Amino acid sequence: MGIDINHKHDRKVRRTEVKSQDIYLRLLVKLYRYLARRTNAKFNQIVLRRLFMSRINRPPISVSRLARHMKKPTREGLIAVVVGTVTNDVRLYKIPKMTVAALHVTEKARARILAAGGEILTFDQLALRAPTGKKTVLVQGQRNAREAVRHFGPAPGAPRSHTKPYVRTKGHEKARPSRRANV
């Protein structure tokens, strides 16, 4: 007797191409697809995979977090590579000099990085400077920093659950339904 093999769950769930219609993003995908194929570097494969990702999976990273990553003594003179957005952080008083390659940098973050004597690269410039990812550090923002993530997890009433409930209001009058429904 043979075994009936169920192929129900066989497909690999991952993006194989970019979903966005942004022509500039598609050009970058073309470039990094070529680099991933022709170079033997894992770096290009990772960048390509991250270019495919949705906006939710490409979270922004603040200048302060970037500075904290690049301040380490082993990372001096390296290029910080962010497949996403670099945002400003007013809480950070002084920004160290650093080289950043990112998909997008906000106006204020750009001004502050350049004022500190730093440099901002685009991904096509990065491909010319470091085609195999030598002297680079891949960094990304926190994916679970979104407010929506607080609602995920075991049900809000369950024991040891810290999940945030979906409620319209905290007011006791509106939230509680009428008790006299069966009269």
Curated annotation (Swiss-Prot):
Listed InterPro entries = Ribosomal_eL18, Ribosomal_eL18/eL18-A/B/_CS, Ribosomal_uL15/eL18, Ribosomal_uL15/eL18_sf
For this UniProt entry, the molecular function terms from Gene Ontology, in alphabetical order, are: RNA binding; structural constituent of ribosome
State the species of origin: Bombyx mori (Silk moth)
What's the protein here called? Large ribosomal subunit protein eL18
Describe the family membership recorded for this protein in Swiss-Prot or TrEMBL.
Belongs to the eukaryotic ribosomal protein eL18 family.
Checking Pfam families in the record gives:
Ribosomal_L18
The record's Gene Ontology cellular component field reads: cytosolic large ribosomal subunit
Encoding gene per record: RpL18
Q: Which domain of life is it from?
A: Eukaryota
> What is one process in the GO biological process aspect for this record?
translation
Keyword Translocase tagged = no
Q: Where is this region: Disordered?
A: 150-183
